[in-house]
Design a protein with these regions (language model features):
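N-terminal signal peptide c-region/cleavage motif recognized by signal peptidases
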Residues: 17-21
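Protease-labile, long low-complexity intrinsically disordered regions enriched in Pro/Ser/Thr
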Residues: 23-405
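Bacterial N-terminal signal peptides that target proteins for export
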Residues: 1-8
Length: 405
């Protein structure tokens, strides 16, 4: 599975309405935060997460929505397993619903489930084929040639390599359709964010969800080092992937002893060696009875510090742009496709850890946790996020992997 629990958040800052006669404005930041946890078995193969039965697994038989795609909105003339997108906003330059479109691809697998219902569904064979790649290259050339001030514009198609396409979602404070009851506990946990409702043609949910079956393998390899002895357990952790991995935790539990090794980053093709006995954590209680301060500091608290955006730990509550970061001439036909980083808001990270800290750090034996590089996520799970000319997307993607040996 591409993501055993992922959450992506789009957070829109409050915007102060401008007079209708204003000739120009700065587009409001729409912060897109995607996160996910990918679980691997001892042999490095992905593990399947628990999905709610209300998620879709087949395209709709209803006629497609008549709402025009977000990418066709006028430009301003003056973004794998269980990803979810949550949206927050204190308001925008317009008073109505916020239009958003999402396209997701999976370069190493096939989409399995999604919600709300998509407008378009392509198989992996089609989306990852040579013809789709060529069509995408042509699309990128056409996007680059767009002239924002042109009065006559030729419409652009969406990304032909996307497997799941939502052309015209709307974000509102209240749901436009009755939400479906979920039968997976984690769904209710991540509905409780006070986020905007995401409305499709016939369904409303607190998030956009997508999941795929992929052929990805764990990026790391753990072997004994050349100085290994029973009382001096020397291990080497090698990154065999093409991208760096970050925030690497190796937690080993044996009887009443716990060891935690941490590496801030391991570049592609490089290794990190450690002696297990040098990383014993003192004052540790059994996980079921609660965690002692030293253990929490070495695990959950440390990971939290690495993931929370210290400069912006909470969503914006007012318009936050200045002359230095003013974005103008926005064209809805041009999506945001590249992540600018990985750090999230504190409540997002706390929710991830509330669900996953026991799996990350409380399992018997050896467990390895690491953060995937945003560039890897952009390649393995291409994400495009469109919005109107009054907003611009700032994308962050957090991918965590947990490997239980």
């Amino acid at each position: 599975m591409r993501r055993s629990l992922s959450l992506a958040l789009l957070v829109g800052a409050l915007a102060v309405p401008l007079p209708a006669s204003a000739e120009s404005w700065c587009a409001s930041p729409l912060h897109a935060h995607e996160w996910g946890v990918q679980a691997f078995s001892a042999d490095g193969a992905p593990l399947a997460p628990a999905l709610s039965n209300h998620f879709h697994r087949r395209p709709s038989t209803h006629p497609p929505s008549r709402t025009p795609p977000v990418r066709s909105l006028p430009p301003d003339t003056g973004e794998r397993a269980l990803p979810l997108l949550h949206f927050y906003s204190g308001g925008t330059l317009t008073s109505g619903p916020i239009p958003v479109a999402v396209e997701v691809g999976f370069t190493e697998g096939d989409a399995l489930a999604w919600y709300p219902q998509v407008d378009e569904r392509r198989s992996a064979a089609t989306a990852n084929g040579a013809a789709a790649r060529l069509a995408r290259e042509a699309l990128l050339r056409r996007r680059a040639a767009l002239q924002p001030h042109a009065t006559a514009r030729t419409g652009l198609d969406g990304d032909p390599t996307a497997q799941l396409v939502w052309n015209a979602l709307s974000l509102t404070p209240e749901p436009q359709h009755r939400p479906t009851r979920a039968d997976a506990a984690w769904v209710d946990r991540f509905r409780d964010f006070g986020a905007l409702w995401v409305n499709g043609a016939r369904e409303s949910e607190r998030f956009v969800f997508y999941e795929a079956v992929t052929h990805e393998r764990v990026a790391l390899e753990l072997t004994r080092g050349d100085r290994y002895r029973p009382d001096h357990r020397h291990f080497v952790l090698r990154n065999r992937g093409a991208h760096a991995v970050h925030d690497v935790f190796v937690t080993h539990r044996e009887r009443d002893r716990v060891f935690v090794f941490f590496a801030p980053s391991i570049p592609a093709g490089r290794s990190a060696g450690f002696v297990l006995e040098a990383h014993a954590v003192t004052d540790v209680l059994p996980w079921s009875a609660g965690s002692a301060a030293d253990f929490v500091a070495a695990t959950r608290a440390r990971l939290r510090e690495r993931l929370v955006d210290a400069d912006s730990p909470t969503p914006p509550t007012s318009m936050q742009w200045s002359r230095d970061d003013c974005v103008m001439m926005r064209d809805p036909a041009i999506p945001t496709t590249t992540a600018e980083g990985h750090r999230l808001y504190a409540h997002e990270v706390d929710a991830i850890l509330d669900v996953w800290a026991g799996t990350f750090f409380g399992s018997p034996g050896t467990t390895i946790v690491y953060r995937e590089d945003p560039a890897y996520l952009d390649r393995a799970m291409p994400l495009s996020i469109y919005t109107d000319m009054y907003n611009h997307v700032k994308l962050r993607r957090l991918g965590l992997a947990v490997w239980r040996l």
